[in-house]
Amino acid sequence: MTASRVRVSHVGIAVPSIDAALPFYRDVLGLEPGQPETADGATIVALALGDVHVELLEPSDPDGPVARFLAKRGPGIHHLCYHVPDLDGALERCRAAGYRLIDDVPRRGAGGRRIAFVHPKATAGILLELTD
C-alpha cells in the first residue's frame, strides 16, 4: 500500500448532545449536517468538510463506547479514521507488526462501511479507525 492511497476519512468527536454541539458546526462554520444514524451505541451526525467529515457522536447506549469515553474523558476527539484501499491487508500488516487491534476482523459501521479499530496503545494514544 502506498501512502498516497491512504487518506483521512473523518474525525469523530464525542459530545453529550448533538443538538447542543451542532450550532457551532452548522451556523458558525457553515457545514451541512447529514441525517442522524445509529451505530455502536451512538447517534452519529456527519458534517462534510471537503473530502473529510466531522462526525458528532452522542451516546445512545449508556454502556456503549461513546458513553464510556465521555464518562472517563469528557467531550472531545474520540477517534481519527483513515480510508485505506485494502482494509483486510492493513489489518494483516498490523497483526504481523504486533499492533493491538480492537477489531480483529472488519465489521459494519455507520453507513454500512467496513471498519476496524486499532487500539490507542498501538498508535500513540489515538484511537484509530480504518475503513475501505
Question: In which residue ranges do the predicted regions lie?
Answer:
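Conserved active-site tyrosine of GNAT-family acetyltransferases
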Residues: 21-26, 94
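Vicinal oxygen chelate
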Residues: 1-4, 45-46, 82, 91-132
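N-terminal beta-strand motif that seeds the catalytic metal site of vicinal oxygen chelate
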Residues: 1-20, 75-84, 132
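Short, solvent-exposed interaction modules
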Residues: 70-96
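Conserved acetyl-CoA-binding loop of GNAT-fold acetyltransferases
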Residues: 27-34, 97-101
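An N-terminus-focused feature that recognizes amino-terminal "leader" regions
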Residues: 24-28, 40-41
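Conserved short beta-strand elements that form part of the metal-binding/catalytic scaffold
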Residues: 32-71, 111-132
